[in-house]
Amino acid sequence: MIGEWNNGTGRRKSSVARVFLKKGSGKITVNGKDIQQYFGRETSIMIAKQPLVLTNHVETFDIQVNVHGGGESGQAGATRHGITRALIDYDATLKSALSQAGFVTRDAREVERKKVGLHSARRAKQFSKR
C-alpha cells in the first residue's frame, strides 16, 4: 500500500475524511459506496470533485474515502479538503493552483454553542414591554 497510494486527511465542521488515491480510471468510492450513491445531491458531488476538476485529474485516479461525522455538506467539504491534501502528497507542484482556489485552507467555521438564558447561540427570548 505504501508507495502507490497517496493519502490526505480533510476536515470540515464536525466531519473527518481520510482519502486514499492511486492511479486508475476515475472511480471514487465513499464509505464503500459509489460517490453518486453516497452523496444524494449533485452539489455535494460537485464540491467533493472540485480539486480534481481544477487540476484536470478527474479520470486519472481511483479514490477511496472514509468519512464520518457531521452531515452531507460537511462530509463533502471534508472530502474536498482530503482530496486536495492527497493530490499535494502526489504532486507538490499542484499546491499553488489548489491554494489559489482556496482548497488547501481548512474552513475553520464551526457551529457556535448555545448560551444559557438564550433560545440558541444568539437568539434571545422574546421581549414583552407589558
Curated annotation (Swiss-Prot):
InterPro entries reported in the protein's UniProt record: Ribosomal_Su5_D2-typ_SF (IPR020568), Ribosomal_uS9 (IPR000754), Ribosomal_uS9_bac/plastid (IPR023035), Ribosomal_uS9_CS (IPR020574), Ribsml_uS5_D2-typ_fold_subgr (IPR014721)
A GO term for molecular function: structural constituent of ribosome
Note the superkingdom of the native organism: Bacteria
- GO cellular component annotations, sorted alphabetically? cytosolic small ribosomal subunit
**In this record, what's one Pfam family?**
Ribosomal_S9
Is Ribonucleoprotein there in the keyword field? yes
**What's a GO biological-process term for it?**
translation
Provide this UniProt record's keywords sorted from A to Z: Ribonucleoprotein, Ribosomal protein
What family does this chain come from, according to its entry? Belongs to the universal ribosomal protein uS9 family.
Q: Which HAMAP family match?
A: Ribosomal_uS9_B
Protein name according to UniProt: Small ribosomal subunit protein uS9
Organism listed in the record = Paracidovorax citrulli (strain AAC00-1) (Acidovorax citrulli)
